[in-house]
């Protein structure tokens, strides 16, 4: 197993905290009911807004010849962060995409800055598939997000939500969250390292032409939509 010796953050993000205001605890049942209904309505509206934006982004990714897929460039944009993962097998430089996966990037960078990942093992190494780490237990059963026990709006106890973007995919070199199902993201992550060309198997009505071309270099499209991609290796594969 490959040992993760240290993770050095070269550029980070400003992390914003959220406060809460508590009113008088003596409230009527009708008031409580109204509050719950308002909260539910707000959540529904928020989810609807996310869905509409996702549809717009998907249409753009599929039809716009000038659509930008950040993984396809080794250049680091102003809205991206860069980290270097130092391992016993060499350094891996990764650029992160907070614009498309803000929760995953914030979680990763915060853990890195606090030393959470220092000394951990790549406990799961599968040739022509991926390498996985981020578990303090070292066996794939541990780890948690930075919000567990602190912010139930982001992690109710089982992990934070999946972030999906039609601009990010599990290409070779992609950094993504390891999880046990939808919205169960904690601290574990993996790097795709499959080299096989499987582009011919990808449906053209689901994958943008540029991404199908990129999958000729390898990757794991079967993981798309299940494991949030939030970074891409730009040196050290």
Predicted regions and their residues:
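Cyclophilin-like peptidyl-prolyl cis-trans isomerases
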Residues: 18-237
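Sec-dependent N-terminal signal peptides of Gram-positive bacterial secreted proteins and lipoproteins
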Residues: 1-22
């Amino acid at each position: 197993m490959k040992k993760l010796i240290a993770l050095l953050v070269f550029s980070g993000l400003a992390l914003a905290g959220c406060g809460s205001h508590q009113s008088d605890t003596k409230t009527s049942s009708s008031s409580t009911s109204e509050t719950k209904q308002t909260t539910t309505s707000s959540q529904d509206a928020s989810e609807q807004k996310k869905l509409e934006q996702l549809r717009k982004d998907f249409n753009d990714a599929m039809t716009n010849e000038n659509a930008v897929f950040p993984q396809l460039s080794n250049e680091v944009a102003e809205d991206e962060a860069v980290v270097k993962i130092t391992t016993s097998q060499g350094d891996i430089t990764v650029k992160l995409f907070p614009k498309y996966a803000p929760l995953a990037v914030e979680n990763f960078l915060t853990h890195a800055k606090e030393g959470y990942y220092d000394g951990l093992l790549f406990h799961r190494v599968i040739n022509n598939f991926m390498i996985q780490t981020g578990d303090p237990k070292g066996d794939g059963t541990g780890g948690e997000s930075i919000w567990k026990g602190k912010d139930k709006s982001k992690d109710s106890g089982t992990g934070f939500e999946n972030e999906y973007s039609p601009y990010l995919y599990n290409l070779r070199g992609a950094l993504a969250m390891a999880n046990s199902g939808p919205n169960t993201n904690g601290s574990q992550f993996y790097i795709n390292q499959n080299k096989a060309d499987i582009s011919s198997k990808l449906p053209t009505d689901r994958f943008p032409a540029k991404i199908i071309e990129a999958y000729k270099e390898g990757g794991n499209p079967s993981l798309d939509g299940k494991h949030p991609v939030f970074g891409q290796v730009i040196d050290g594969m």
